[in-house]
């Protein structure tokens, strides 16, 4: 065994090391690069094939050497930087490559040009050998850069980033390439030897010599074709579209704008020196820059004062008041601009270097689409890489980072150049750097830990805890002044304001754009001044201009004006009253109006007092790379030309299309009777459509001059293929291929034929088949039409795609038109009339030429749009044309008379309308539509032949008598034949009867067998005949319905015959029975007859046998294959369930306990017993039962008999079980003899010291405690049934108010239900004792009776207190179930989880009216499960939950349970024994998300004051306040008071609440009597949340009702649409008032008359629902996003459990709150409190994360490069809970610290750690699943 393990281990490790070594990987990648065969191989193969003799061998050697040297240089250039830069620069390679190519072609085509006549054999002097060496060397270098090669050659570069020993990798990859190259050359040599030895090739010596002589020319041609093919893919480096005009204009504009800025800056300084500044209001009013788009975040090199500066120096412009005295209408520096333009035109060509003329690095050199951005006129360079590789320090070591900032790396390189060599040598080595990094991390960790511990100690002293909290980091201007909140980048949330800044569009300084400037810009400026003063009052730069001088009265006049025309650019009001002195300004001249408006605002607001300091906004912007060009497409160019703006040639290719003019409207000029042609062209209105070809346009939206896309894997098999695509999408095309028929379709087709209908029903399906045939014919016709249409379109596209084809076609059409009109048709007319003359008939010259003249040829566009007769379409020669023939001429043999009957005349007119026009084809034929098939014309000779037939018939009619006699003779013979047939039919039965009588007795045959029974044979014959007659009768019945008279007659004859035959056969059979009714005779059967019958029977039944066999195959095999996954999954689920059950019981106990089966623990089905092993190991398994409560398991085991449970000893003595068991349970099992004394003596751990660990042990008990509705959304039914098989408890200690219920109906419990109820009580007590086993207070003793036998002095029940802390909004960590997450949708439906498969009705679905049945909580009882029993109760119960509404943050719940007589307590099933109460709206709690009720108005008032998690806390407003409650409201509650004071205040409130509830006897009567006071008090409660200082400030009735309206219908978060303005809000308020009134009709009518209520906006009660509002865009409903999905319950639960810890700084309330509740319900408990504060919240989130990482990640274990930081973190986190290592250390500080740190980890923090801290991001969110959130024990 040792030897085998030694061998196997060594072999595996050795193989893994060899495979993963750098040498093997390098050899593999190098071998792969051999297959990247490029043009450089042509020279190598040329030398191998062509050269012979001694010189040929030298050339072969030199070619191979050059090839290898070139490849070696390429491999070295990967590692050696200077060589890589030299070979990688496109300028150098291209400049060297192009002359060398020319030289090479010149050398090959003129061989004797460099022939010096030297006969020396020295290879160094032979220039041709050297050229072979150079060719192979240089073209190996070109292969990577000038000629694109395959991806295989670049694999070496890819692996370089992963390899540490790069030089070894490069060497090994070169060796691998060399091996592959040698093998390739050997293979080429073998092929050449085979060619030389081939007899067929050697016999043709002449061809071989010719081929050898022309080999050089063939290789040069191949090389030239390859180079052209490769170079055709990339744009030419010299002849490119440089966009010179835009380049010049952009540069000139940049420089001129900078000059203007420079002059304005000098003016500013001068003016500041003089002591005053004058502001320029036009740009400064609106915080916008000039119209120059090039100012925005560009990185272009520009000239300022003779120095090169980048645009980065200018991208943080002050968008503020520029202190230059320029006006809004123009620029004072226009003269300077013109001078600069002239200078730049002269100096432009001299400043350009040669490289920029040849190569423009800013041009589009890849296939790129131009994406416009409205904010930036120039396009963003989106092909810039998001990754930048550079070395950086990570985990104390130098590593490559792919997200390193490029600017930082460049800056670091610049610094390194400046630093001397002496300083660079002082840098730390790798190991020293790593140790130093560890040391600094330890220092950071210690300092943070000490600070953290100090904060905790300060907090324990009871000081004011706000000073303990870590403050947020903020920027400050000085020591005493913070930076403004909206400008502070370290803040987030609502402090950061959003400034809507609309940049001005690109505007040219032309006269035509002045109107647009006035219309668009100035109104936006005015609106921004007036609008921003109201909206952004916190922004200082908006408030400062109006601090010293208020807004003048003139501006106030325009507030209403601007609000009406928000966003519009023009005013259309006829008369607008502006001021008293300006009464009306007509809107006919709006320019005067706007100028007046702007001048008024400027003069009034800003020229009276001028601030000394200009206010600037430092814009926080991100630098985005842009192209230096502004490109436009054809449509934009046309728009600019139409608007007479300065346009430039378009550079973006549009889709190739043709403009089709289908309507031209020419308006005649009435003023000018002889208009010019120019006037006509201006007035002509053309309606144009663009026609695009159906082929794929690969050039659309591509910039001119950019490289075309290198499309691969596209197969073109047709000469003209419209839509080319990859074979990958072959299945999506319409063409049916062989591969599209899948195997499944083939199977279906086979079995469909054999499993079809019976052949007996074929006759009855005759009509259906006829209908199917007709449908198929219709489909075939449609398909034919589609094919013809496709052919027509293909022909049209073919003419379009072939270059020059339209010119040829147009000329051919014109010649065909002339030939038809003037040559062909006149010749036909003359030939016809000459023929008539020769046949002695009158000619029809006039008629024919009349029809000929009516034919007109009209030129049409390519699409067939008709023009005038003499007018040609535009660009007809290039775009194509059609010729339409109106009234086409058709040659007729004669013309009929004009007088015809009416119906013939009508048909003729219809035919003429059809043939009214046609189109001429290229061949000269006629077609109905362009490029359609040629139509058939009536034949010229067809009417002539018809006339000849008529003549012949007349001749035949002359011999009518002869024909009559012949006919009589024929009829006589036919009649005679019919009579003989009838006679034979009558005689046939008589002969048949005689034959049957003779055949009854047969002679003995050869084999001597017995007689045959004639009866059996006759029965068989009659059966067969009856079968045939039945078929014919069915056929007769069906065919009698046909309309044909001939078939009808035949069918009647057949029916008569069959009837006669049938009657005679029946008569014969009856006679036979009379002759021998009882006697059975046996006839003889020979062997041949028997075999013949069996053969026939087998043949007859073989079809049915085969059919049955196929059906069985299909039904058994294929359906079984389909159901295999289902069977496997079912077996797996059942086996897991049985395995779990078997681990609890064993086989014997199962068989004995089957009679008393309980629904929570499933027994093993006997069917699956063979699949389960019965070994002892399985009996010891006790796995994580996520669906079983362990306490319940032990409880059920305690109820079982001793004999059945004696084998549970192994289970109960399992290691770790003692931690779960209480002493009472151990004693009980000990009395049963199941456990031993060891189990009882084990010491329990201190749960107060290690609560998190205890919760982890118990975490599986209730992690899937979901309600029925939530389970139905998460998992399938069967799995749900298994998981939810744990007990849940009913809240039966609910003390209801009988006076308020006022119900006489009682639902009596059945005995079974009572038993189950008692069982739940027992488990309730057991589970409470189980969880709270650390509590040593044994003053309570539990029993199993229905009413708990407890002290009467105690006013509490343990039924409600086993999970008391569940309802706090900050929960204990060991007690967080998944039901806490369901606070959002707290179901008011009874949880009927005890019977899981039971169907029940959800009462929330029912439609209740708005006024009646409102208080749903009053008549639906709440029954909660084991983790939900202290949730919100309805208002008519005495469990009253109090909340102090004065504080926005602090939330407490006080519960009081009154002990009452248990005899009157009845089980309330679904709350149906209560009366449905009619309550007003004011007593309503909104029933969907009632947790939002308490903080609704406060959150609406100031949303960011309250942490959002408080809305999800379990706090509900109870409306049953007593009169004494107002006393508590008067006291101001401060959430930030110290803990001692606050505790006393809470105790005082608690005592008052107890007195209220004890003294109150009838809560329902109190609510009914004090109805109006309750309404008022309800309103005041909301006001108190908003205004906690003031006691009572009641709202108006409208506001209060409006709040209630929103409270009622706020089922989702409502996001108001923009259309919901003040008018709609007024309507809502009136509507809310009306809802409460008893008789609202009068107020409705009056409000409608006063126009306060609009019935168009508001909806009536029937249509009052959210979908209608959503359709009318009144509301946008955004439901709360819950992270619940049907899969991944584990991740769902863990995420919820982690995220439930509250993030608020006020979590210290949790401790005081838990103490109050515990003292109230349980009396004085131990000092080991379970609810402790999470002290890490004292730190800020950033420092908290830093502390976590420094503590959790042991930096000394993080050694390797490939180690996973997640795994290291998990490994170290396990040490927190290791009792041997960790818990024995400093118990007072370290253990408590780590205890609180790890549970408060959040999932998002872990994700951030993965992405940012470790600088890695694998793009997979599933990497988080590798985290072991809870360590194993």
Curated annotation (Swiss-Prot):
It is found in: Plastid, Chloroplast inner membrane. GO terms for biological process: protein transport. GO terms for cellular component: chloroplast inner membrane. Residues 259-273, 292-301 have a biased composition (Basic and acidic residues). It is a multi-pass membrane protein. The chain crosses the membrane at residues 18-38, 67-87, 90-110, 127-147, 175-195, 218-238. Keywords: Chloroplast, Membrane, Plastid, Plastid inner membrane, Protein transport, Transmembrane, Transmembrane helix, Transport. Residues 254-301 are annotated as: Disordered. InterPro entries: TIC214 (IPR008896). Pfam families: Ycf1. Belongs to the TIC214 family. PANTHER family: PROTEIN TIC 214, PROTEIN TIC 214-RELATED. Involved in protein precursor import into chloroplasts. May be part of an intermediate translocation complex acting as a protein-conducting channel at the inner envelope. There is a partial copy of the N-terminus (positions 1-481) of ycf1 in the inverted repeat (CAB88779). This is Protein TIC 214. It comes from Spinacia oleracea.
